[in-house]
Amino acid sequence: MALPTFSMRQLIEAGCHFGHNTRRWNPKMAPYLYGQRDNVHIIDLQQTVPMLYRAMQAVRDVTAGGGRVLFVGTKRQAQDVVAEHARRCGQYYVNHRWLGGMLTNWKTISHSIKRLRDLEERFGGGDLLGLTKKEQLNLGREKDKLDMALGGIKEMGGLPDMLFIIDTVKESLAVNEANKLGLPVVAVIDSNSDPRGITYPIPGNDDAIRAIQTYCELISGAAIDGIQAQLGAAGVDVGAAEIVPAETLAAEAPAAEQQPTA
């Protein structure tokens, strides 16, 4: 069991060093910028490498302690990648519009998740007798809408222990809610980002698909390493184990062997 490895060359090949046009920058990002080329800011990957590794260690510590990590990326080029890698490591995701209060008003969100489950049971069990085609169509649309918004967190069972965010400008609501609740945030910060409020910043390109894929693979791998450590501590055969949601592991592991969340 070990954290995934990566190199600066890998980050360069993924285009992680390209920031935005120099006119679209946040001066608070100046410490993380190497310079500019053709009116585009170049991010200092010599800082990114250790900061990315530190973020991976933090994610690993959370999942090793049975904690939950919420992946957030609603921009078009991040949606599929975020969902894929959150599922890969048995974690959770929001890859469509962030609903205001998704964290700070969890009670209301929980009611919406219950409604989604009820609708899924009705459709799955064929419990639609007595409904007109129009009523069935309307319920189907409601289910699809709820699933798009909440499908990635319907198994989360409570607030996450950490957020991993792609594009803090677009996901400013998520950052603000996490800060309000004191939840640690791992996030990719581009040249137009505000690094304030980010517990574990990762300076890098948050627009290129290859860059997003690289971050998500590494963070997902770190989460898996933590889960494997927890399974090993609980005496589970890691080689035969299947990655399952974190709260399931926490429920099954002996209480004395669960490690505190970082």
UniProtKB/Swiss-Prot annotation:
Keywords: Ribonucleoprotein, Ribosomal protein. GO terms for biological process: translation. GO terms for molecular function: structural constituent of ribosome. PROSITE patterns: RIBOSOMAL_S2_2. It comes from the Bacteria. One of its GO terms (cellular component) is cytosolic small ribosomal subunit. The keyword Repeat does not apply. It holds the Pfam family Ribosomal_S2. CDD domains: RPS2. HAMAP family: Ribosomal_uS2_B (MF_00291_B). Belongs to the universal ribosomal protein uS2 family. This is Small ribosomal subunit protein uS2. It comes from Rhodospirillum rubrum (strain ATCC 11170 / ATH 1.1.1 / DSM 467 / LMG 4362 / NCIMB 8255 / S1). The gene is rpsB.
